[in-house]
Amino acid sequence: MKKILIVLLVIFIIIQFFPIDKTNPAVNEGMDFLKIKNTPEPIAKTIRNSCYDCHSNETKYPFYSHIQPVAWLLKNHIDEGRKELNFSTFATYEPKRQAHKLQEAAEYVEQKKMPLESFLLGHPDAKLSESQRKELANYFRTIQKETETTNAL
């Protein structure tokens, strides 16, 4: 048992020498959702606080991002989040995709699927109140409808 613990400790120490890349991709404000949709500041603040760490190129890495293997899991989570929806590159999405992503965002916020519980453990200030959830879902749906109307044939 003692040998197993020593081996595990050595492995834990060794993996600390393999950090994640915390470089955020460049941000072009002209492609950012909050800018192109002229999001009102109170709603923009909520989106930045509760969504942007995983769904933008403006991730603020927490202290535990220095500890492996937790950091590897965190990096994978952020990469997956950006792949699903990246507010920093929202303007590059086709209008149909924009509308679909906004519909999904509204549903996920309403159904309490976002922000993830695992994210809230390290970011309790990102937790949304019921009124914030309603406000965000309504905002996403409003922008979704505007996007669909503007781009209807």
Which residue stretches match the model-derived regions?
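Acidic helix-start/capping segments at beta-turn-to-alpha-helix junctions
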Residues: Y61-K75
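C-terminal capping alpha-helices of c-type cytochrome domains
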Residues: Q111-M114, L120, P124-T150
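The canonical Cys-X-X-Cys-His
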Residues: I47-E58, M114, L136
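Extracytoplasmic electron-transfer domains, predominantly the class I c-type cytochrome c fold
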Residues: W72-G122
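Sequence/structural segment immediately N-terminal to covalent heme-attachment motifs in c-type
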Residues: T39-Y52, L74
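Sequence context of c-type cytochrome heme-c attachment sites
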Residues: T23-N38, F87-T92, E117, L121
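Soluble non-cytosolic domains of exported or imported proteins
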Residues: K37, E41, K45, K96, ...
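Post-cleavage N-terminal segment of exported redox proteins
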Residues: M1-L34, T142-L153
